[in-house]
Amino acid sequence: MKKLYLFLLVALCGAMINPAVAKKKNKKKASTEATTKKKEKKETKYDKLFKGKKVTTAKGFITLHQFDNKVYFELPLKVLNRDILLGSTIAETTDNQFGCVGEKSSDPFLIRFVQRDSTITLRRVQAGQFSDDREIKKRLQSSTMPAIAETFEIKAYNNDSTAVVFDMTSYLLSDKKMLSPFSPYSLIEMMGANIDKNFEKESSFIQGIKGFEDNVSVRSLLTYKVSVGAKGGYAVKNMPFSAVMNRSFILLPEKPMRHRYADPRIGIFEHSIVEFASEGRGLRTRHIAHRWNLEPSDSAAYLRGELVEPKKPIVFYIDDAFPLSWNKYIHKGVEVWQKAFEKIGFKNAIIAKDFPKNDPNFDPENIKYSCIRYAPSTVANAMGPSWIDPRSGEIINASVTVYHNIVQLVQYWRFLQTAPADKEVRDVVLREDLLGDCIAYVLSHEVGHTLSLMHNMAGSSSIPVESLRDPKFTQEYGTTYSIMDYARNNYIAQPGDKEKGVRMTPPELGAYDYYAISWLYKPIFEAKTSEEEIPILDKWISEKSGDPKYRYGKQQFKRRFDPSSVEEDLGDDPVKASEYGRRNLQYILKHINEWVADKDKDFEFRTALYDEVVYGYVRYLSFVLADIGGIYLNERYDGDQRPSYQTVSKEQQKKALNFLLNELKDLSWLDANETLKEFPIRTSVAMQMENAIIDGILSRCGAVSICSDKATSAPYTQKEYLADIERFVWAPTRAGKTLTDTEMRLQMNYLTKLIEGSVTGVAKNATRKGITDMYGIIEIPEWLKAASRERFGIVSEEFMGCFNNKHAEMQAARLEEISGFEDGVDLKAPLEPMEHVYFGELKKIRSLVAASASTGSADTQRHYRLLLYKIDQALK
């Protein structure tokens, strides 16, 4: 009974305990149980992957993890199968002869990350084919599936299973051609040298990572042993070489920009895609223009005619490594293009900014940022490539690289081309503002390329030569209708012209430049598709087709048919322009010592300038030579006012020939004995130029043949051309005169070329060159090219066209050029039998020489006997 009482008492007391205290005890118990369970939770693969590691993490659209010289990608599942642009940029280098900071070894390319079971595959995406037909599109997708370039094992899912983690190190620390540190624009590549390289993985490292909302980047330090081949061995053998490469992964929009179809009648960079049409048209090649995605921020205001800023302006960041004095001129070279965009309603469409000082997110090697980069290189060059979204042609990134030695080259240009008329440039170093204008010109030309404008070599070809000595005309138009032409400075202007107000330099922008920007970037609101834009774009070009200011002339490389599309020339008449140019060169040689002798004690400047005088003379002669057998070429659509081609008139061709032949009469000014007598000793340039001119004249026979075949009236035939040369060459012999040394050399050169063009006797074994070579120009002497390379580095054909300074063995072979969107045209000389003509000429010359063998001086007679011997040997 007592025990029962105690039990009931305890129970009653328990029932009377405070409910809040009881609740607290229950919570404590539950918390203890939860903690125990938490301790018991297993570590995930994701946790184990990074456990105990010193991990650096960068969060962007992909999260990057760096540790133990490895880089892991944490790729969200929602990013799988998305289009990503991958590009590689040189950030640092131990030797910029293999590539300069800021250069990219290849165009960025499209990739996708695709999951396959327990792996992630990196796939290369093809964007070169399309169809609007649903069924064809399905088959195209299965026929052009993205190729697997690399496979990675999935190491883990993140803890909420929204992303996969895999090791990308093997891809980013390897020798991949598309991600290489060896630039195709490098000095070594331009020399045509063979590069043997061995990648050294054990000496290569992951150096850094960055992540942003729409892009991530990885820096890889790559190390090689490099050997550079030279004749008979190696110039460099197993040299250590390292470069830091910045690899950018950019997430492209799911919906590409609406593309604009290109037109071959205007010089815009483009790429081609193949359309599989369903309307019975079969395959159709379409050309997609490259352009920035400029859209008005306020469409209503834009349509009212107000100036409107774009949603996303074009921004160029200027390298802080440039000499400080260049900075404002670089800004000017970029922002001068604002004028062209303002004409089509955009305000502040293109902006130049200095490298940010306190922005941790800014990275000039990140492909997201477009930059003007400085390269401390001996090369005298600048370039402005751009990189695109291949799905739409949208320009994603563009960078201008300016090589330091360009300032040397532009100073020589300015002096050479304008010193006779402009006293201010008669100095060994240009005044800062004059040099600044030269820098701004180079920058504006290269920025034009980044905006997608190609070279327009016909920019000055319709300007009357005399207009280039007219103050009113030159102040309005400068030297050309397009700064995308290679029309440098006003070499037409004569002493006294500047005082009259004649402009010495190109315009800031030309009429064609405004027109090209308008065609490429003006919004077409009324068109809902790219196809609907075509009639409007076509009209914009067709309505300008009768105005020569807006003519587009393609840059010609190996084959040069069109004399109006030649680098460095000015004006509509090469003969008259070159006459003015030659007078100015003679004026320079006559006065150079009085202008700069006190500042050029070691003759370095004057020696270099003399070489540039010879180079300039070769250019002027070549402009004239191009008229012989020349054909003006135009891309034409039905209804356009210009013809597709038009031959140079017989009168102009004969005028050009007479100019060149008359130049041969007196080239002694090139040796300028009074000027050069204190210079280091050198061989006679006049004699070398004699040979080059006659070689050039005779090399145009094939071009004359094509031109006469295409002429609609009064053709200048190859027979007439040879007859005109023959009359000039043998005129002193017919007159019974004593021959000068020049006349004897001319006759010997002519006879040698004539023999090479025949198939008789010893000529059967001769190399059939010269008289049957229709693509010749006045050859630049190899010693002159060598001196130029020593002074300016290798200046390639992309910067100087056919007047580049590459050695003959460095010249890259080009594919046959065709019309349309390609570089030029491919024409074959008509199969007109000419051997009998050459044979007849040899017989006629033999008769003339035999009849004149006893005339003239003893030297002249010995010369005739040698000619007779050579002819008889050829006719055996």
Task: Cite the ranges covered by each PLM segment.
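The catalytic-center signature of Zn2+-dependent metalloproteases
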Residues: 354-375, 437-494
